[in-house]
Amino acid sequence: MLVLARRTNESIMIGDDIEIVIVDIKGDQVKIGVKAPRNVSVHRAEVYKDIQEENRKAAETKIKPEDLGKIGDILKKKDSGKKG
């Protein structure tokens, strides 16, 4: 792990297009800003772990393609029963 010291308003570059800026430092809390292209996902570590866990659970779901068709039929019947 690379460890760098930075002060408020100083930054770190990752590659050519990701910039990490130290926005504020108060006590033991550091606020950072991340400038990155829209196609780069940026998450806090605890949120990222939750996303990974949900993706893992979704990948393990054992839904068969024919079951998806049945769900579609049920939704169509439900929608056709609505009054507009």
Curated annotation (Swiss-Prot):
Cross-referenced SUPFAM superfamilies: CsrA-like
Principal cellular location given in the protein's record: cytoplasm
InterPro entries: CsrA (IPR003751), CsrA_sf (IPR036107)
Residues making up the signal peptide according to the UniProt record: none
Pfam families listed in its UniProt record: CsrA
Subcellular compartments: Cytoplasm
A cellular component annotation (GO) from this entry: cytosol
GO biological process: bacterial-type flagellum organization; mRNA catabolic process; negative regulation of translational initiation; regulation of bacterial-type flagellum assembly; regulation of carbohydrate metabolic process
Cited function: A translational regulator that binds mRNA to regulate translation initiation and/or mRNA stability. Usually binds in the 5'-UTR at or near the Shine-Dalgarno sequence preventing ribosome-binding, thus repressing translation. Its main target seems to be the major flagellin gene, while its function is anatagonized by FliW.
Family statement drawn from the similarity comment of this UniProt entry: Belongs to the CsrA/RsmA family.
Assembly description: Homodimer; the beta-strands of each monomer intercalate to form a hydrophobic core, while the alpha-helices form wings that extend away from the core.
Protein name per UniProt: Translational regulator CsrA
Organism: Leptospira borgpetersenii serovar Hardjo-bovis (strain JB197)
Lineage: Bacteria, Pseudomonadati, Spirochaetota, Spirochaetia, Leptospirales
